[in-house]
Amino acid sequence: MSPTGFTRAAAAPPPTLSRHAADTARLAAPLAIAQLSQMAMSVTDTVLLGSLGPDALAAGGLGANLFFVVVTLLQGVLTSVSVSVAHARGAMAEDRVPHIYWTGFALSLLLAVPAFALLSFAQPLLLAFGEPAALARNVGEYAAVLRFAAPGSLIGVGLMRSFLPAIGAAKRLLWVSLAGVGVNAFLNYGLIHGAFGLPRLGFLGSATATTITIWLTAITLVALLHGRSTFRHFVAATRPRLPLMGELFGIGWPVAITYGVESTLFLATGLTVGVLGESSLAAHQIALNVASVAFMVPLAIGQAANVRVGYWAGAGAPVAARHAGFVALGLGVAFMSLSGLVLIVAPHAIVGLYLKLDDPANARTVVLATSLLGIAAVFQIVDGMQTVGSGCLRGLKDTRVPMLAATLGYWGIGFPTGYWFAFHAGLGARGLWWGLAAGLASVAMLMTWRFHRKSAALGVRADARGQA
């Protein structure tokens, strides 16, 4: 998408459904690859930490998970930047964009303060939860390094992933993210093992490498944004505005809560599966990992829908906003249906990427993982639907009711249903996954219904203004 593509569209007739689909896919593709690149960095860290032994892997893995949970929740607040920019551009008020950018920049730095504080107290927090003292100490040391990456993550991932797509610069995220995978792998190996002339830091080398990579990513994205004449007018120097910061926070904090509600659902499900034994937990991790990779695509489509629905809503074109949302929902469901078909057709091949299928010791895990992938085929469709629906509603600046819907669906329906199926109906891990599917399906239906109602009401209000 060209940087001026939205502006040209504002003066033209509303796009056809096929044009909506093409524009959404064009915007979502680099976002999906950027998110997959972030997953690749995590996999690299895990593999290289594993070379140091189980203790390093456990401490580094838990420390990294703690970091990413904290910053991901806070990044949810910054999703308000993209919809605010999209609305401003749709309304042909691009002079407001620099104010949104610099206010969002200041907000990202403020959000880094609680992230830094939480990560500073990782060791006492883990001790309070009864973790072994040695593990808590190692995780505390790992998090103490990663805490310095919090501002860079909130700027380079939180702010830039919201701002760049909204001004038509999503491809910058793509190339910088891909480069970050290589830089992270090089620094991880070098700092863990003392290779390439770098100091040998052991498992803390991984935290140091991740911190450096995150900051390099943030600095590069900011430099590309400010250095290109095409985008410079979007970031013209101006002071952050406190009322605008309150508006951005008001839109964004329910998104952060929604992220937290969903994250805790999957965390609680994993802990509950662990009660069923190691084979069940291993099968659960395999199925969840596969589903997480596929989820990156509808997540990106949801981010694209956020921008496109917001743009057309800001332009005062409610029909185009409605079409943009439902086309995005269709794309998300279509992709996840194809992905689910792969899980149904080739589950053994997928499980074989994680385990040796001919090893008798893996037999129970293979059977259960194959079964869970079948459930994941259904789970994925509604998961994609709910995340795209959430993005559509963010485009209308509607975040508080979706937060309540997610809380109800995940914790009022999903987890209780899964628990009952697992322990009262005797389905074990499969029951918990059916519970996840039920919770996600309820949220998907609520999000879709809410978008239908909100977008229809937007059209009614526009018609009333036109008649007046």
From Swiss-Prot:
Keyword set, alphabetical order: Antiport, Cell inner membrane, Cell membrane, Ion transport, Membrane, Transmembrane, Transmembrane helix, Transport
Leader peptide range in chain numbering: none
GO biological process terms, semicolon-separated: monoatomic ion transport
Single GO MF annotation: antiporter activity
Pfam families referenced in this protein's UniProt entry, alphabetically: MatE
Main location: membrane
Subcellular location: Cell inner membrane
Function of the molecule: Multidrug efflux pump.
PANTHER family, sorted: FMN_FAD EXPORTER YEEO-RELATED (PTHR43298:SF2), MULTIDRUG RESISTANCE PROTEIN NORM-RELATED (PTHR43298)
Family, similarity comment: Belongs to the multi antimicrobial extrusion (MATE) (TC 2.A.66.1) family.
Protein's name in the database: Probable multidrug resistance protein NorM
Species: Burkholderia mallei (strain ATCC 23344)
Name of encoding gene: norM
